[in-house]
UniProtKB/Swiss-Prot annotation:
The UvrABC repair system catalyzes the recognition and processing of DNA lesions. UvrC both incises the 5' and 3' sides of the lesion. The N-terminal half is responsible for the 3' incision and the C-terminal half is responsible for the 5' incision. Interacts with UvrB in an incision complex. InterPro entries: GIY-YIG_endonuc (IPR000305), GIY-YIG_endonuc_sf (IPR035901), GIY-YIG_UvrC_Cho (IPR047296), Hlx-hairpin-Hlx_DNA-bd_motif (IPR003583), RuvA_2-like (IPR010994), UVR_dom (IPR001943), UVR_dom_sf (IPR036876), UvrABC_protein_C (IPR050066). Residues 12-89 form the GIY-YIG domain. This is UvrABC system protein C. Residues 193-228 form the UVR domain. It comes from the Archaea.
Amino acid sequence: MTRVKDPEKLPDATGVYIFRDRDDRVLYVGKSISIRKRVSSYFREQENPRLRIMMRHLESIEYILTQNEKEALILESNLIKRYRPPYNVRLKDDKRYPFIKITDEEYPRVLIVRTIGRDSARYYGPFTDTGAVRRTLKLIKSLFRIRSCRRMDGPCLNSQIDLCYAPCDGRISREDYREIIEKVDLFFQGRYQEVIEVLEEEMKEASERLEFERAARIRDQIESIREVMERQHASFTDSIDQDIVALERGGDTSAVVVLQIRDGKITGKDDFILRGSAPRTEILEAFLKQYYAIPRRVPSEILTQYPVEDGVIAEWLSELRGEEVKIHSPEGGAGRRLLNIAWKNASVILKQKGRVRDALLQLKDDLKLPEIPRRMEGLDISNIAGESATGSVAVFIDGKPSSGSYRRYRISAQGPDDYAMMRELVERRYSSPELRKPDLVLIDGGKGQLGVALEALKNCGVHVPVVGIAKKREEVYLPGLSEPVDVDDGALQILRHLRDEAHRFAVKYHRTIRDRDSLESELDGIRGVGPVRKRALLEHFGSLDGVRDASVEELASIPGMTREVAERIHRHFSGDLAG
């Protein structure tokens, strides 16, 4: 890369330019068919206050020449992702969104990941709804029985309860397994009808070969996929593939919503927050470059709220898709109606974001924090008289739950000693020097719990702001103050939400541990019920009460369960212990 200070020394050629400050930090990355003309324009434009601030910090300019504008676009996108310059319009915190990964192993797995590796695996995402991704992955595994184990050391629990084809045990050929993975691939592309057509052909062949059990299984797969399709109830007459992209801007923050239409049905919605002050068309183009730079299915048509003036974006997307991609902004008709739906969603998201931002600012003032608490962690303990004690950490980023960052702990402290349990939780959470430190720690409890948490943090050598919130009167306590502090309603609402999330997560884990222990103890004396069936019962029915209330037919329907053992379990809980 070549570096200059005088813009007149820049080449009149296509490429990428990089603004750096006196500490060599990257301020901004851009592309142009004429680097000299584009960079010179920054020195003339003085209306944008954000631009004026950037130019005051500018110390040097680097440039990289490319053969054409498409190469420049790809390089610009990669450099923005690498350096995350403060003055570029960019997706906020995009790393925390999950992806679906289909691995490139001999027998591929399907995983949820948060980064894209430099490998030949297939990735889908990012997805903004982590819960929906987990539910979808669970459905995929139950439908297609793909492997989950990292190592193929032999048959595992899933193969024993008929949830995996067990390629580790040679029960399925590589070719047959790859055909299953291709169906999974189509599913994540939203091409449900194609999956159904393939499965219907397989069901027909199985019936002709008198493989009725296999045919019935395929029939159930088809019904499950049709249920997914029915949930995507909004549909159109044309079987089209489109992305509908609309944005709403407020100050230096913009919300963008993408409606995904596959085979004429709305199959998904993604929403993103972008940082950076720029004209709406520039924000839109910056979003498109970042959104599609991540491996994902590119539709044949992209409808945008404003015309996209940079023609190289469509050229680049067409190359990614392998055929022409049209980007246009319809004036009316169904396309404009869809854009209005996306825009209304973006407007609501931006308003909510504004309210949360105001509440975080108020929280900073009310709690006398050194900075806005962008990352907050709430800690809670759940137990009954010291039994099955668990601890949880809920994480909020910019006022919203980041459920993928939640953590839970099995507490080893003995007896009903809440202080000892909180001390253990804090020390286990913050003892690692690699852990990202939060801007605020919230303890579910009053002055006593707050004092214990402070002491534990001190033992860990961690110095972060800590507050406690008492359940009884929703009072907020700061270290060193005997009386609770006044907190604005909006700010208090965020603290309550964080406290409630930590409590919910701790209680959920506590119940899981308690039910598992109770179920294992209750089933110990029943002949034919070993560890595998115990786990299958808990996973299927969720609790001891669920097993107790189940009929013989429901018990027998669990994969790997015989009717004889199901009847034995049912008799046990009915009070008839014979047999």
